Amino acid sequence: MIYGIGTDIIHIPRIEQLINKYSTKFINRILGKNEITIYQSLSIKQQTNFVAKRFAGKESVAKAIGTGITSSLLLRDIEILNNNLGKPIVYIPNAAKILLNNIKLTEYKIDISLSDDYPLAIAFTVISASI
């Protein structure tokens, strides 16, 4: 059963402006520890696209959960990493798992698709669940 669907689209130049203005403070607010390691290994252009896709992805995950970003579910707490084939995989913290369990989701799967084509990045998330 589909529990939730979320999507988000972002203007990449907006992310570029925020990175230029706030630098590390902005990155630390958006990316998790594992994502920061990946971010630091990328070229400047790749970094901006990486952050834009992660920002859109995290927003779409929060929308699919049904809460949006809240004090118990921060952007940096959701990590979107890639498997060895490049497929994006969503990792969520215990707080989000507790939130999903509180709304009676005992078994769930989060699928996400990320794409960027300058000047836009988009994410689409589907949460499938057993209730």
Curated annotation (Swiss-Prot):
Pfam families listed in its UniProt record: ACPS (PF01648)
Listed EC numbers: 2.7.8.7
Source organism of this protein record: Orientia tsutsugamushi (strain Ikeda) (Rickettsia tsutsugamushi)
Function comment: Transfers the 4'-phosphopantetheine moiety from coenzyme A to a Ser of acyl-carrier-protein.
Subcellular localization, as worded in the UniProt entry: Cytoplasm
Family: Belongs to the P-Pant transferase superfamily. AcpS family.
Gene Ontology MF terms in the entry: holo-[acyl-carrier-protein] synthase activity; magnesium ion binding
Protein name, as recorded: Holo-[acyl-carrier-protein] synthase
One cellular-component annotation, GO: cytoplasm
GO BP: fatty acid biosynthetic process
Binding site for Mg(2+): 8, 59
Cofactor requirement: Mg(2+)
Reaction(s) catalysed by this chain's protein: apo-[ACP] + CoA = holo-[ACP] + adenosine 3',5'-bisphosphate + H(+)
InterPro entries: 4-PPantetheinyl_Trfase_dom, 4-PPantetheinyl_Trfase_dom_sf, ACPS, Ppantetheine-prot_Trfase_dom
Keywords: Cytoplasm, Fatty acid biosynthesis, Fatty acid metabolism, Lipid biosynthesis, Lipid metabolism, Magnesium, Metal-binding, Transferase
